[in-house]
Amino acid sequence: MSKYSDAKELAGLTLGKKTDYANQYDPSLLQPVPRSLNRDDLQLGDELPFMGHDIWTLYELSWLNSKGLPQVAVGEVYIPATSANLIESKSFKLYLNSYNQTRFDSWEEVRQRLITDLSHCAGEAVEVAVNSVTHYTQQPIVTMEGECIDEQDIDISSYDFDDRLLEGAAGEEWVTETLHSHLLKSNCLITNQPDWGSVEIRYQGHKIDREKLLRYLVSFREHNEFHEQCVERIFTDLMKYCQPESLTVFARYTRRGGLDINPYRSTEQAKPDHNHRMARQ
């Protein structure tokens, strides 16, 4: 259980509670979660050691045009890691559902409403794209870059989070490389539902021991935090124990409620080169 799972800032969330589904536009449904909750635990100050965004894909975005004809789209939202808040996912889903029976004059009006409401909730300007299904169908399904570390023949008996599994993980050899794993699994901070993801780690520094890294990632299996918080924890732990010169951590989680979340944290750039989905998304 997270150290801050009982924080008062989480008490009013709709997550884990029975809720009604509104079908008329209602921006008040959005609920923020202060990023400071886990960043205080990670001892992160105002000067963050990373750049980045939380990239959301909205697969269930629909509204009515001015004549009442339903429209469907796939949305992409980029929320800066520097924003005061992350957006709680169930509230995001409920908010998007509120578009379903609401008439809008144009796709651009929908995009601008999303920008305004999500920026207000996050506490900083967000970027939004609203794409046609035809456009999205033309996008590729990709895999992560670099070496997959999942096929190691090792025994694991503990699934409790332990950052000390990274102790001594940095070797002597200096490398520039990319590693990835599809075995990332954590649990929702509130509901304990499983969150399934893949994570890509790109770095320049002393070569990271594959076994230690895999054991560390598997230790998230019974850990309770939101997606964004897990990625920041991975980033800060790798910086603490391995001290790379440069580091990028990019996780892509499977969708729930028509949404997937893809947190990106990097010393090098604020956004990934692309937002193509993976096979499990």
UniProtKB/Swiss-Prot annotation:
Pathway terms, separated by semicolons: tRNA modification; tRNA-queuosine biosynthesis
Protein name listed in UniProt: NADPH-dependent 7-cyano-7-deazaguanine reductase
GO cellular component: cytoplasm
UniProt keyword annotation of Hydrolase present: no
Keyword Oxidoreductase applies: yes
NCBIfam families (alphabetical): QueF (TIGR03138)
Gene3D superfamilies, per the entry: 3.30.1130.10
Tree of life domain: Bacteria
One Pfam family here: QueF
Molecular function per GO: preQ1 synthase activity
InterPro entries: GTP-CH-I_C/QueF, NADPH_dep_7-cyano-7-deazaG_red, QueF, QueF_N, QueF_type2
Enzyme Commission number(s): 1.7.1.13
GO biological process terms on file: queuosine biosynthetic process; tRNA modification
Protein source organism: Vibrio vulnificus (strain CMCP6)
Class of enzymatic activity (EC top level): oxidoreductase
Stated family: Belongs to the GTP cyclohydrolase I family. QueF type 2 subfamily.
Alphabetic keyword roster: Cytoplasm, NADP, Oxidoreductase, Queuosine biosynthesis
Major localisation: cytoplasm
Subunit structure: Homodimer.
Comp. bias (Basic and acidic residues): 268-281
Spans annotated as Disordered: 261-281
Catalytic reactions of this protein: 7-aminomethyl-7-carbaguanine + 2 NADP(+) = 7-cyano-7-deazaguanine + 2 NADPH + 3 H(+)
Compartments it resides in: Cytoplasm
Binding of substrate, residues: I87, E88, S89, H227, E228
Binding site for NADPH: S89, K90, R256, G257
Annotated catalytic residues: C188, D195
Function: Catalyzes the NADPH-dependent reduction of 7-cyano-7-deazaguanine (preQ0) to 7-aminomethyl-7-deazaguanine (preQ1).
